[in-house]
Design a protein with these regions (language model features):
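Short, well-ordered beta-to-alpha junction loops that form the rim of enzyme active sites
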Residues: 54-63
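A broad detector of the eukaryotic-type serine/threonine protein kinase catalytic domain
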Residues: 20-24, 47, 77
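Phosphate-handling substructures
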Residues: 1-38
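Generic structural signal for well-ordered alpha-helical scaffold segments
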Residues: 40-48
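GST superfamily/GST-like fold recognition
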Residues: 62-66, 98
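Conserved short-loop catalytic and cofactor-binding motifs
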Residues: 23, 27, 56, 83
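Acidic, low-complexity terminal tails and accessory targeting/binding regions
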Residues: 1-6, 33, 48, 52-55, ...
């Protein structure tokens, strides 16, 4: 069974805070800043290579999507942690973009699971 859900989320939030503040030690695969830069570079690539007439599908993890949204919304780093904890597996987030801006239209939708016989399939990790 493992730890209670609340304890898991608290530990995850604490770990992400320490990662964000560059307080983790050891051989980390990526710093918070490198992760942020990588996601921003992907967003910039999409805005440069595609026009507002194109449809672009982005498939990603919740963490990368939360960071993408942070950049799109010009939000604080704390927002990434909060968004990441809310993102449901297989959710759909919809936005519009051009070469200057990304605008979010919807976030974290699960229309394919949003019915009584599929509610148990909604998961977060």
């Amino acid at each position: 069974e493992g730890a209670p859900v609340a304890a898991f989320y608290k530990a995850l939030k604490t770990a992400m805070k320490h990662w964000r503040l560059d307080e983790l030690t050891g051989d980390l695969p990526e710093t918070w800043q490198s992760f942020s830069d990588r996601v921003l570079a992907a967003r910039n690539h999409i805005q440069k290579e595609y026009s507002d007439k194109d449809r672009v599908l982005i498939v990603s993890s919740g963490g990368a999507m939360a960071m993408f949204l942070k950049h799109a919304l010009n939000a604080a780093d704390d927002t990434v942690v909060e968004l990441n904890l809310q993102i449901r597996n297989s959710s759909v987030t919809h936005g519009f973009f051009n070469n200057k801006v990304v605008r979010m239209a919807s976030f974290n939708n699960v229309p394919h699971l949003d019915r009584p016989d599929r509610f148990e399939a909604i998961t977060y990790f």
